[in-house]
Amino acid sequence: MDELLGEALSAENQTGESTVESEKLVTPEDVMTISSLEQRTLNPDLFLYKELVKAHLGERAASVIGMLVALGRLSVRELVEKIDGMDVDSVKTTLVSLTQLRCVKYLQETAISGKKTTYYYYNEEGIHILLYSGLIIDEIITQMRVNDEEEHKQLVAEIVQNVISLGSLTVEDYLSSVTSDSMKYTISSLFVQLCEMGYLIQISKLHYTPIEDLWQFLYEKHYKNIPRNSPLSDLKKRSQAKMNAKTDFAKIINKPNELSQILTVDPKTSLRIVKPTVSLTINLDRFMKGRRSKQLINLAKTRVGSVTAQVYKIALRLTEQKSPKIRDPLTQTGLLQDLEEAKSFQDEAELVEEKTPGLTFNAIDLARHLPAELDLRGSLLSRKPSDNKKRSGSNAAASLPSKKLKTEDGFVIPALPAAVSKSLQESGDTQEEDEEEEDLDADTEDPHSASLINSHLKILASSNFPFLNETKPGVYYVPYSKLMPVLKSSVYEYVIASTLGPSAMRLSRCIRDNKLVSEKIINSTALMKEKDIRSTLASLIRYNSVEIQEVPRTADRSASRAVFLFRCKETHSYNFMRQNLEWNMANLLFKKEKLKQENSTLLKKANRDDVKGRENELLLPSELNQLKMVNERELNVFARLSRLLSLWEVFQMA
């Protein structure tokens, strides 16, 4: 499969020159002459990615990334022409650093004349690793199963931090600076755990290859392999080439995740170790699965309660590693623009969720992993209040004089004696109470009993939100393909309600439920004043949550003869919200860097070795107050950035 990927990297692309010519139509002045504020507002992706790269790699790297985001793929020569103050050597040096951190992908193309040109693309995966770097370390430390908590967690943090800082590393290089044999054994076992949990994977050419170009090469290869004299129609040829390309594409994509390519057995100790020469890198998709689980747990907590959400947390963690990817690579190939392909992709995703081994579970599976401090006893109602009313009603009915029964010949059947009737009733009540007591005792014996866990799973499966699906009695799986759109909708409504008010959320729901509505229908269903409805609609339209559609009633297209209807287009709304949150995150990073620049002299003085720890003695009172203000504002930025990040990532997930 490496040979196949190698062919893709060195494949001849006859359209390379025409693509370059079309890109030359956009001059550097079109981007660089825009004022700073306008440029940041027009392209939130550019604003965020430049600020992130600037904070980690400096101004030159930010300029290169900015050009790649704004103009698309570029060669070294084109980058030199478009960026002032950078020559060929500086551009190449910067590209090496960006490529090492997986912020840039590249592809070599051969023109008709035989000239080879390497084009560079920005890679959002590497930039997102920089964005999540601290959270990645924290998440992995939380999920790792270690014996000595403090020492081993510190070692894990150092390993992950080194991998993020260098982009990739081998175990052999990492252990070269370790002298103790026991420490080498410990670190080697931690590397094995990280690989088994999926947080570290083998780095390959795939991480530096544009997905769109890889798919295009595979598709064209299989299409050309079909004989020209084949009796198949062109439509069937394309369909067959597409199926074969999908198979090869899946093999290439999944190869870095295969443990057999990473782990081996040490002949000396007979223990599993990571191959010393294999380069390892961070698996961002594995980390994002954990972030997705957290979002779903928070959603379950608001819908079905905290105890049931804890049971749901165990179910998600149990199946998290084998769960579907956050964003399937096929969605980045442009293949899903075809409606039939999109529908078949959705159906296939639902089938994979149900049939993949390791994604289904039952109550017994969860009972083995429930924490000891979680007690499920008393978390469910053992008897409905209506049962008491029914029982008291039946007793009252029994106390009333019963209707006399007669035989065919007119003989009246006498009622039972009062003593006998009373004894039968008491025995029946005693039997019911004994049965109830037995049920309650069964629940109170084991805090993690299968019956209690199964009851919580049924609550999740019967909720209006599809947290779980039941394939067969007692066996469940998480329907991510159905649940993620619900999560997006819920978070979007939360943001709208918290920023524009509950009335905006009510109108948004009303329009979305009715698809296409007029103002008259909104007035009759929203139960709000007409003045409030119009002002709220104006706010929703400004935030791209609601769109206006003109429907002419006659051939005359004047506005006075048209009807204006309202509708919600979720794709546009979510994209606008994502860009809005993205811009706010970038603006926070921009303000943080600006704050550091304004106080650079004070920060340099405070970070000197002879001043650290003696600030109260060596700094003036005004400098101490200024330093305290800078630190507080920086902490405030990180807190706000964390909240924005948790909202933004929901709209990033497919």
From Swiss-Prot:
Biased composition range(s): Acidic residues: 429-444
Main localization of the protein described in the UniProt heading: cytoplasm
GO cellular component: cytoplasm; nucleoplasm; nucleus; RNA polymerase III complex
Keyword Protein transport: no
Any Pfam family hit: RNA_pol_Rpc82
Entry-annotated residues carrying Phosphoserine: 392, 394
Keyword Phosphoprotein: yes
General function of this protein: DNA-dependent RNA polymerase catalyzes the transcription of DNA into RNA using the four ribonucleoside triphosphates as substrates. Specific core component of RNA polymerase III which synthesizes small RNAs, such as 5S rRNA and tRNAs.
Quaternary structure annotation from Swiss-Prot or TrEMBL: Component of the RNA polymerase III (Pol III) complex consisting of 17 subunits.
Matches recorded under PANTHER family: DNA-DIRECTED RNA POLYMERASE III SUBUNIT RPC3, RNA POLYMERASE III DNA DIRECTED -RELATED
Protein name (Swiss-Prot/TrEMBL): DNA-directed RNA polymerase III subunit RPC3
Species assigned in the record: Saccharomyces cerevisiae (strain ATCC 204508 / S288c)
High-level lineage: Eukaryota, Fungi, Dikarya, Ascomycota, Saccharomycotina
